[in-house]
Amino acid sequence: MLVRRRNLLAGAAALAAAPQSLRAQAAKPRVTFISQWSAGSDGAAITGLGKRLEEEGGIWQHSPVPGFTTEMMNKLRADIIAGNPPAASQLKGPEIAVWSKIAPTVNLDPLVAAAGYEKLIPAELVGLHKPQGHWIALPMQVYRTTTLFMSRPAMKKVGADKAPKTWAEFNALATEMKKAGITPVANGGIRWDDGMKLEIALSGINCEAYRGALMKLDPKALKSAEMLQAFVQLRKFADWMDPAIAAQHYSVNLPKFLKGEMGMLMMGGWAQGVIKNLGGNLDDVLITSVPQDEGKPVFVLNADSMIFWARKEPDLAAGQQLLAKLMMQKDVQEKYSQTTGSIPVRTDVDLSGPAWTDGQREASAVLNDSFKSKRVLLSLAHNMAQTNPITAAMIDVLTEYVHNDKVTPEQGVARLAAAVDNARG
């Protein structure tokens, strides 16, 4: 009995003395992850990613935070302050650089280089995910925020057989729909929805005016004739919206939209996943780009991403390596986007198969064309173009403008420029 105890003690001592690298090899890869994705197509997609990680031998521990992004960010901040950040978390756009200064992150450069990944994704995304010159986050999926969904039943009521190509054509069609008793614009009443409407209008008027005003915050661009024109168009949108949907999600109006009681929905490509999740039929919807007065493709980009936080535990470090490799794989991106209605981050994915929708194929083609012609823009309303404080200040102005018709377009332009000045200090 004494010999047996001595053997056990010797074995335990040997294990404790084993090199850390050997213990790391024995650790089962584990990922702790927090996000706001808990339901709908986003919830289904992230659950699918977790299952794939488990199939590859990992452990997936997702802690969804109910509510909007603010609640998730508060949880993340609390975990970081407590010295217990998750292995990975939802984070996007310029906030990746901001938050990387709060806590140490994982250098993903070797994995990205081995996958040849950087050359496969839009250049606008590269800088956002490698602040200070190193990859610390990875994009998961891409959406176009300027997608036009048209109710075919509504189109039939007014004899429309094609999508408008210019804002003048859009306005004429909306006028006909209103005369026919159709609410021309299906909308939501949430802040980001209001903010999207300006980027939709401005990107369809002039690509470079958008880049200068909303991405570079150039004072002249913020007060330009194109910006005034965008505010005029935004007022038209507001007049054609359902005023009874205050503070509600746009999906509340989708049943009316699918029946033809509402005509046109300007939304991100994710609406495809929402429509399918609600049991709607995409055959009842024409999906294309919002009007482009310049006659050239423009892609206003929104991307969901994960940032990887430095952890010393071998199992978490191994889990981060496994997760990062999976996120860059073509088949994983295909499955994720097919679930949510997005398009893959990789530009080399073939979308000709039956699992993809016509809307996804069209958006992917526009992304590739815009990528080649350098007409890819970053979304303001979805925190891709600016940091949260500046975005919030601008959205405040836009929300007030949309819901208060006493504010003139000229006043709207002036207030937006002033809000930017104040937010920048």
Where are these regions (language model features)?
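Conserved N-terminal structural module of periplasmic/extracytoplasmic solute-binding proteins
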Residues: 2, 7-14, 21-98, 102, ...
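Extracytoplasmic/periplasmic solute-binding protein
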Residues: 18, 135-140, 146, 171-219, ...
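Extracytoplasmic/periplasmic substrate-recognition and gating elements
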Residues: 29, 51, 55-56, 156-158, ...
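Hinge/lid segment of periplasmic solute-binding proteins
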Residues: 94-146, 171, 197, 286-287
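Mature extracytoplasmic/periplasmic domains
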Residues: 104, 110, 270-274, 306-388, ...
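Short, solvent-exposed loop/beta-turn-alpha elements that line the ligand-binding surface or hinge
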Residues: 109-121, 189, 205-229, 277-280, ...
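C-terminal capping/gating helix-and-loop segments adjacent to ligand/active sites or protein-protein/ligand interfaces
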Residues: 139, 306, 365-419
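Glycine-centered hinge/linker elements that transmit conformational signals in sensory
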Residues: 174-176, 216-246
